[in-house]
Structure formats: structure tokens, C-alpha cells
Amino acid sequence: MSRVAKAPVVVPAGVDVKINGQVITIKGKNGELTRTLNDAVEVKHADNTLTFGPRDGYADGWAQAGTARALLNSMVIGVTEGFTKKLQLVGVGYRAAVKGNVINLSLGFSHPVDHQLPAGITAECPTQTEIVLKGVDKQVIGQVAADLRAYRRPEPYKGKGVRYADEVVRTKEAKKK
């Protein structure tokens, strides 16, 4: 039985929740998010809280209810506060610049890398070696950050590459003669 699913999600003032079958729409000051939940999950909205439980006849009902609760909690946080993800570029000549909804990266390749941002995601570069991603959808921000990191992952000898701001890169010792 899922302990996560037993905790209700508190819906703050100014957030509108619409339940249409298994399709949940949450609208707040930062935007609107929609998600289709698994058929094994039953969602109830009462007194500014969302409660979750399994439907009869589904073996994985509690597990799916816990997943649905975590997803909807992230949606509520996203439309009220939003999410940010910070990336750092470590290496000589590694630079980033934002032009509109395109991030231009110089990562030591013979060509610049241009990454198109999806709708709803904004980026800014406080310095040439930092990227800050902002948006309402936690999953999309994480995917964009992972895509940017995949262009040049931190290598284990000097730690050069694109890394998350809170990431600790374990370095190896160089070969000795």
C-alpha cells in the first residue's frame, strides 16, 4: 500500500482544478498543465484538497495512486511557484548565450551547438558559463537540462563539460609513469 498516495495534495488559493474522467487540468498564475492519469487511480477534489486511491479491480492501484499524487503535486507547485534548473559549463572556451528561444553553446566542437527550447521553457545566462532554465512543467525542464548536459557530459579526469549546478563530478587520478 502506497504511503505517498495517502497524503492529500493541498490546492492553494488561485489554483483551479478541473477533473474530466481521467484528464486533470490545473490552472494557476504561471500557466496551465494537463495530464491523463492511469485508469487504476481515482481522484477526488473537495475542500481545496486532492485525495487519491485505487479503483477496484486493479492490482497496481496503490502504486499508480502514489505516482499520480506525486505528478499532480508537481503540477500544483509548477503553476504556483514554477521550477528552475541550473547548469554550469566547465572548461576553457566553453560558453553559452541565449537568443530568443535558442541556446547557443560553444563546447569545444568545430561548430557551435544551437539548442531549440520547447514551448513554456525560458532560459537565461547570468554569466557565460551558467544557464538557468525556468518553466512550469518539471518533467520538461529536467529533459531539456539532460539534453543540454548530453552534448558534453563531465569527463572524469578534469571534470570538463556541462554539469548540473549541484552535481559533484568524481574525478579519477591520471595514469602515472
Curated annotation (Swiss-Prot):
Q: What does this protein do?
A: This protein binds to the 23S rRNA, and is important in its secondary structure. It is located near the subunit interface in the base of the L7/L12 stalk, and near the tRNA binding site of the peptidyltransferase center.
GO CC annotations on file: cytosolic large ribosomal subunit
The subunit structure is: Part of the 50S ribosomal subunit.
SUPFAM superfamilies, alphabetized:
Ribosomal protein L6
Q: What is the recorded name of this protein?
A: Large ribosomal subunit protein uL6
Residues modified to N6-acetyllysine: 44
| GO terms for biological process, alphabetical | cytoplasmic translation
GO MF: rRNA binding; structural constituent of ribosome
InterPro entries in the cross-refs: Ribosomal_uL6-like (IPR000702), Ribosomal_uL6-like_a/b-dom_sf (IPR036789), Ribosomal_uL6_a/b-dom (IPR020040), Ribosomal_uL6_bac-type (IPR019906), Ribosomal_uL6_CS (IPR002358)
Which keywords appear in this protein's UniProt record, sorted alphabetically? Acetylation, Ribonucleoprotein, Ribosomal protein, RNA-binding, rRNA-binding
User: Coiled-coil region(s) at which residues?
Assistant: none
What Pfam family is a match, any one?
A: Ribosomal_L6
Name the protein family.
Answer: Belongs to the universal ribosomal protein uL6 family.
- PANTHER family in the record, alphabetically? 60S/50S RIBOSOMAL PROTEIN L6/L9, LARGE RIBOSOMAL SUBUNIT PROTEIN UL6M
- As recorded in Swiss-Prot or TrEMBL, the protein's gene is named rplF
Q: Record's NCBIfam families?
A: L6_bact
